């Protein structure tokens, strides 16, 4: 089953370009067309990759649905709550007007609930009894109150539960209050009796029931309450109408304080709203000046306020409307889009229709009613008799939102202001800088998105310079520069490493602790770097190195006698390891430059000084071998002074120390100076965080897999951490120190050997501890992809120009080399040295380089590409050796880098065609010419100089011009054939295929000698 691309993008909440790019990475070519169909397998891959986007989309839809449901529930709940509290307001209004006499009189017939109402009122009216107009009645009321007090609470409860019923019971409640005071004693007695009858049913602990107001919604108690209330009405209003007014005023004030004021003064509320809105207008006008985006919102709110002002003066409606439309039509549209898109857009359309259809008063009214959204409550109040529920919902929502969200709304506006300001600042910075930070081979689509232009414009620009590019084609640096310049951008290239770097966390100053300094020992070959470390470590390091030369960067953690710690990096000295030395200077804090006192400041020493200076590393000079008889430390200091490196003894800023690494002279003083420099630097690190640091070396160990020497620069590296270094990653399975002792963790400035990486990272790569294995894998894969693409792009392909150059040279040769070594740094150094050997005639190509022993796959590659295999401190496996013998592949093994370079150079010289030189052997003068039948012309001649041989070649010279070149046919002395004739001897000589010899000609004989070419 196939699925269309547009359905996939909707389901997974991603763009078509993203889907197409992902499938292309997986090896599927898919057209970027919404109607393109993909297979189930491809769909499954997409679901696996982009399931998070899909889940986010579903989650957001679910959240929106829940919020809509909540809004609906709130609306219905607010109505119920409103009915419980608010109907008293509307009832009060009705009672005041005229509804009382019509509804109350028919309900007067049954006598029953008078007492309940009385009780309610009496409990509240106990203070009112201070006005003793009818004295006897007051005394009786007290008795009734004492008897029925426990029931009063419950009656209130029942009334609350009854609230969902119509507003009729509530007028009943309000009238009985005044009547209760002056009822005849007989009716009161009857009521008391009825109440007593009902008491056993309802009388429970009143305090408990008060808490559970909403639960007892029994129908049985409701009906008797209604009957009793009806009875109350009958008796009271007819007999005492005048006195109702006096007592009723007190009750209304006491009961309806919380609810009445809201509905009593709707006009006052409007005035208050208008005043508040005017205040908001003033605030918003100030905001306008600061923020452009706020203007639309403020204008829309101003428009609403202006509309309300226009409602009152009818005469000015027309003029105001015209002015408002001129100024604020767009603002209303914008506001409608921002606030309530669907309903308001419809209303704005209706408004337009009303305005356009005619100029009568009806149209004016329509326009004014619909113009302002906040006036809808007013319209609904007019129709409130028809649709009470909607009015309640709208009014309550408006009132509650004003009470609750007033502060929240203000805070939100402040937040919006701040965020908008920040956004504008960012936009300005972007506009000012216009610098694109990118890697070299980005796609046309990515470049377009970075410049915020359409990809079609980028493709069009490329076509205008004669390049046909597709949307996902990667562009080289030159093209990117051209396109970016066309759109007014500058480009700044960052490597793939930088682009994919992990965000560094900044450490708080209180978390930092002092760490040991990392000291690099640099200098020329055999000037005593390792001997110095040897003395400091009290161990013979040199014994393990081939030829006594340090091949790898050694990292050592040393604890001095006073307990202070220093980490040393011992870098190789000879020029092949320039890259390694540069890397060592990058991770170091202090550099010790060693110079032998019996030698001079060598080129490698100068290079080491330059590396340290370029890295901004403090330098301490150690002048070694002062115990030798011919040592001259002052000469070294003089040479350094000529290089602008004045030591402290000569008034400069660089510390120096005369030492003897073998005997230990001056070494403690040197350590003091190093530690002094370290104190000046105030080196600190945070051990309580994920580790970061540098890869010093990496190698493939047959028993342990890929092993990397790392130097922790910050944090603490523990066994079990997930480490990402370059394109390699893995979980740390074990850690060892430089003495091969297992350790559990390594803090800042500690070098350790780690096991568990899935490859050999390049020496000098930075490593980071990542939280999850998945994240590390993703970053490593992306880096590897960029590295591979970079390699493919930079691979020099054979062009016609190159072919022409080779033909012109005539004898062009290529030497393909495969380099295998024990550690990454040595492989890199050897490869660079071999590539430097290339000349115009012979090009050296390192087609493959890797860590580990020579395998069968290396031999296969060498056989296919006519390459030789160079192994540096590694050996081929048994199967690889046999395979190489069968295929005739040359495997050369070395343990010292110089030997490898020299032999390759010799092999290259052997590949060159030997140069042919002519060596003149003799000069012969022709004295006589003899014409002999069947033989030809023979010259009688004398050898003027040299020795002529029978095998030599000859050329005939007449008057200084070469007439003929050929070989000697016969050489005779008297009648005998001879092999050679010496100087001043006569001889007979004839030339092959040439008879025009004349007296006085000169014959020059020569031989061709092949001279071996050198590079």
UniProtKB/Swiss-Prot annotation:
It holds the Pfam family GTP_EFTU. GO terms for cellular component: cytoplasm. Residues 514-684 form the tr-type G domain. GO terms for molecular function: GTP binding; GTPase activity; translation initiation factor activity. Keywords: Cytoplasm, GTP-binding, Initiation factor, Nucleotide-binding, Protein biosynthesis. It is found in: Cytoplasm. SUPFAM superfamilies: Initiation factor IF2/eIF5b, domain 3, P-loop containing nucleoside triphosphate hydrolases, Translation proteins. Residues 624-627 are annotated as: G4. Residues 124-144, 159-179, 196-230, 250-386 are annotated as: Disordered. InterPro entries: EF-G-like_DII, IF2_II, IF2_N, P-loop_NTPase, Small_GTP-bd, T_Tr_GTP-bd_dom, TF_IF2_bacterial-like, TIF_IF2. Its main location: cytoplasm. The keyword Cytoplasm applies. Residues 570-573 are annotated as: G3. Residues 196-217, 265-315 have a biased composition (Basic and acidic residues). CDD domains: IF2_eIF5B, IF2_mtIF2_II, mtIF2_IVc. Residues 523-530 are annotated as: G1. GTP binds at residues 523-530, 570-574, 624-627. PANTHER family: TR-TYPE G DOMAIN-CONTAINING PROTEIN, TRANSLATION INITIATION FACTOR IF-2-RELATED. One of the essential components for the initiation of protein synthesis. Protects formylmethionyl-tRNA from spontaneous hydrolysis and promotes its binding to the 30S ribosomal subunits. Also involved in the hydrolysis of GTP during the formation of the 70S ribosomal complex. NCBIfam families: IF-2 (TIGR00487), small_GTP (TIGR00231). This is Translation initiation factor IF-2. It comes from Bacteroides fragilis (strain ATCC 25285 / DSM 2151 / CCUG 4856 / JCM 11019 / LMG 10263 / NCTC 9343 / Onslow / VPI 2553 / EN-2). The gene is infB.
């Amino acid at each position: 089953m196939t699925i269309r691309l547009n359905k996939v993008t909707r389901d997974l909440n991603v763009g078509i370009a993203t889907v197409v790019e992902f499938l292309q990475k997986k090896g599927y070519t898919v057209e970027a067309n919404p109607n393109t169909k993909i297979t189930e397998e491809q769909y499954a891959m997409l679901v696996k990759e982009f399931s998070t986007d899909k889940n986010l989309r579903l989650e957001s839809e679910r959240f929106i649905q829940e919020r809509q449901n909540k809004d609906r529930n709130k609306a219905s709940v607010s109505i119920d709550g409103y009915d419980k509290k608010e109907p008293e307001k509307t009832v009060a209004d009705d009672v005041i007007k005229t509804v009382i006499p019509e509804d109350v009189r028919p309900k007067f017939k049954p006598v029953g609930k008078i007492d309940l109402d009385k009780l309610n009122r009496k409990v509240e009216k106990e203070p009112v009894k201070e006005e003793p107009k009818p004295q006897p009645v007051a005394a009786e009321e007290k008795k009734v109150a004492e008897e029925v007090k426990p029931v009063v609470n419950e009656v209130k409860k029942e009334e609350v539960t009854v609230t969902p019923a119509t507003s009729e019971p509530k007028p009943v409640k309000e009238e009985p209050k005044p009547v209760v005071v002056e009822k005849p004693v007989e009716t009161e007695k009857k009521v008391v009796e009825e109440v007593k009858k009902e008491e056993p049913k309802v009388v429970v602990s009143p305090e408990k029931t008060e808490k559970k107001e909403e639960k007892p919604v029994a129908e049985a108690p409701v009906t008797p309450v209604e009957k009793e209330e009806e009875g109350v009405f009958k008796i009271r209003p007819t007999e005492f109408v005048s006195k109702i007014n006096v007592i009723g005023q007190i009750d209304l004030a006491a009961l309806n304080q919380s609810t009445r004021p809201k509905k009593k003064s709707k006009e006052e509320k409007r005035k208050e709203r208008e005043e508040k809105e005017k205040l908001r207008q003033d605030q918003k006008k100030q905001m306008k000046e600061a923020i452009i985006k706020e203007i639309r919102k403020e204008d829309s709110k101003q428009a609403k306020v202006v509309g309300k002002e226009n409602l009152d003066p009818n005469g000015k409606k027309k003029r105001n409307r015209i002015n408002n439309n001129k100024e604020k039509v767009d603002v209303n549209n914008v506001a409608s889009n921002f606030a309530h898109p669907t309903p308001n857009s419809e209303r704005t359309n209706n408004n337009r229709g009303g305005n356009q259809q005619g100029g009568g008063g009806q149209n004016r009214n329509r326009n004014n009613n619909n113009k302002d959204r906040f006036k809808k409550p007013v319209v609904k109040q007019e129709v409130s008799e028809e649709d009470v529920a909607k009015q309640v919902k709208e009014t309550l929502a408006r009132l509650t939102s004003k009470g609750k969200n007033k502060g929240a709304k203000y805070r939100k506006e402040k937040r919006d202001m701040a965020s908008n300001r920040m956004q504008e600042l960012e936009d300005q910075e972007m506009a000012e800088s216009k610098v694109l930070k990118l890697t070299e081979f980005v796609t046309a689509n990515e470049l377009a998105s970075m410049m915020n232009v359409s990809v079609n414009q980028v493709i069009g620009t490329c076509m205008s310079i004669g390049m046909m590019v597709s949307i996902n084609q990667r562009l080289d640096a030159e093209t990117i520069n051209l396109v970016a310049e066309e759109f007014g951008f500058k480009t700044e290239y960052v490597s793939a490493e930088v682009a994919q770097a992990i965000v560094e966390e900044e450490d708080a100053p209180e978390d930092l602790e002092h760490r040991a300094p990392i000291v690099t020992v640099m200098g020329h070959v055999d000037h005593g770097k390792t001997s110095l470390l040897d003395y400091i470590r009290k161990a013979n390091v040199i014994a393990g190195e081939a030829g006594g030369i340090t091949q790898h960067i050694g990292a050592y953690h040393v604890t001095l006698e006073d307990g202070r710690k220093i980490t040393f990096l011992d870098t190789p000295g000879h020029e092949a390891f320039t890259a390694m030395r540069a890397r060592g200077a990058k991770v170091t804090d202090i550099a010790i430059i060693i110079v032998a006192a019996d030698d001079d400041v060598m080129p490698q020493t100068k290079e080491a000084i330059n590396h340290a200076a370029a890295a901004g590393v403090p330098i301490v000079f150690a002048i070694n071998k002062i115990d030798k008889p011919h040592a001259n430390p002052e000469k070294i200091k003089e040479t350094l002074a000529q290089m602008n490196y004045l030591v402290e003894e000569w008034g400069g800023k660089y510390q120096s120390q005369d030492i003897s690494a073998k005997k230990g002279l001056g070494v403690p003083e040197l350590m003091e100076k190093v530690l002094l420099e370290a104190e000046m630097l105030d080196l600190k690190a945070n051990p309580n965080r994920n580790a970061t640091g540098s890869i010093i070396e990496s190698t493939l160990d047959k028993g342990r897999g890929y092993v990397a020497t790392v130097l922790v620069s910050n944090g603490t590296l523990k066994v079990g951490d997930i480490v990402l270094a370059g394109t390699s990653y893995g979980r740390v399975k074990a850690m060892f120190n430089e003495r091969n002792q297992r350790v559990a963790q390594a803090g800042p400035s500690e070098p350790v050997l780690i096991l568990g990486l899935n490859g050999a990272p390049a020496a000098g790569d930075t490593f980071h501890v990542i939280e999850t294995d998945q994240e590390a894998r993703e970053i490593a894969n992306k880096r590897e992809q960029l590295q591979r693409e970079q390699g493919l792009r930079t691979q020099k392909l054979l062009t016609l120009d190159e072919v022409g150059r080779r033909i012109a040279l005539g004898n062009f040769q290529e030497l393909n080399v495969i380099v295998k070594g024990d550690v990454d740094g040595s492989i890199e150094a050897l490869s660079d040295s071999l590539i430097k050997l290339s000349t115009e005639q012979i090009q050296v190509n390192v087609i493959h380089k890797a860590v580990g022993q020579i395998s069968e796959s290396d031999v296969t590659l060498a056989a296919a590409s006519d390459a030789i295999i160079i192994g540096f401190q590694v050996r081929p496996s048994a199967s690889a050796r046999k395979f190489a013998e069968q295929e005739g592949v040359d495997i050369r093994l070395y343990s010292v880098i110089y030997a490898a370079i020299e032999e390759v150079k010799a092999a290259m010289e052997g590949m060159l065609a030997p140069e042919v030189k002519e060596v003149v052997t003799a000069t012969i003068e022709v004295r006589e010419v003899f014409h002999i039948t069947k033989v030809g012309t023979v010259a009688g001649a004398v050898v003027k100089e040299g020795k002529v041989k029978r095998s030599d070649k000859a050329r005939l010279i007449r008057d200084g011009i070469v007439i003929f070149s050929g070989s000697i046919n016969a050489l005779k002395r008297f009648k005998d054939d001879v092999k050679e004739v010496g100087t001043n001897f006569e001889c007979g000589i004839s030339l092959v295929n040439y008879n025009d010899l004349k007296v006085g000609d000169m014959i020059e004989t020569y031989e061709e000698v092949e001279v071996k070419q050198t590079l």
